[in-house]
Amino acid sequence: MSQDFVEIAKIGATYKLNGELNLYPLANSIETLLSYGDWYIQLPATNVWQQLKGESVLKRADKVYIKLANINNADTAKKYVNALIGVPKRALPQLAEDEVYFKDLIGCSVKNINNDSFGVVVDIIETGANGVLVCKEDNSEYLIPYVKQYIVSEDLNSKKIVVDWEYDY
C-alpha cells in the first residue's frame, strides 16, 4: 500500500496460550487507539502494511492485550511479536495550524538562534505538562522543553527546528 501510515501501537510478547499478545499503545490512551477505526499491521522486518483482523482488545488493570482473528495458540502468535500497528494518516484528526504530531518532530535537526547545533530529535518525553525533545549530537544528548517559549520556528517539510536554548541550560 502506498498510503502513509502512523504507528499507534507495538505488539509485545504473547500473553496466554490462546494467542493473546501484549499491546503497547503509542497514543495517550486505549480509547484514542480504538477511535481510529481500521487498524493495519506491519510484521517485523517488512515494509508492508496489511489490514489487521482483530478479534478483541482487552484492558486488564494497566495492561492492554490484543487477540488477532484466527490466531488460537501462542506458537502462531509469536510471529506477530514486535509487529507495529498503524492507521492511515488520513484517519488522524486534522490539526490546528499551530499544532504538530510529536512523531513528525522525530528526525528534525535542531539549532539555536546562534546556529549552534543540538543534533537531531531522536525521541520525545511526555511529562504531562509538556513534551521534551530528546536531541542527540555525536556523543551528547540534550533535553529541550517543547513549549512556545523556547521554540522559535519549525519547518517540518525541511525537518528543521530553531530554539531559544543554550548548551548550558
UniProtKB/Swiss-Prot annotation:
GO terms for biological process: ribosomal small subunit biogenesis; rRNA processing. Keywords: Chaperone, Cytoplasm, Ribosome biogenesis, rRNA processing. Pfam families: PRC_RimM, RimM. GO terms for cellular component: cytoplasm; ribosome. Its main location: cytoplasm. The keyword rRNA processing applies. Residues 96-169 form the PRC barrel domain. GO terms for molecular function: ribosome binding. Gene3D superfamilies: PRC-barrel domain, RimM. It comes from the Bacteria. The keyword Cytoplasm applies. The PRC barrel domain binds ribosomal protein uS19. An accessory protein needed during the final step in the assembly of 30S ribosomal subunit, possibly for assembly of the head region. Essential for efficient processing of 16S rRNA. May be needed both before and after RbfA during the maturation of 16S rRNA. It has affinity for free ribosomal 30S subunits but not for 70S ribosomes. Belongs to the RimM family. Binds ribosomal protein uS19. This is Ribosome maturation factor RimM. It comes from Francisella tularensis subsp. mediasiatica (strain FSC147).
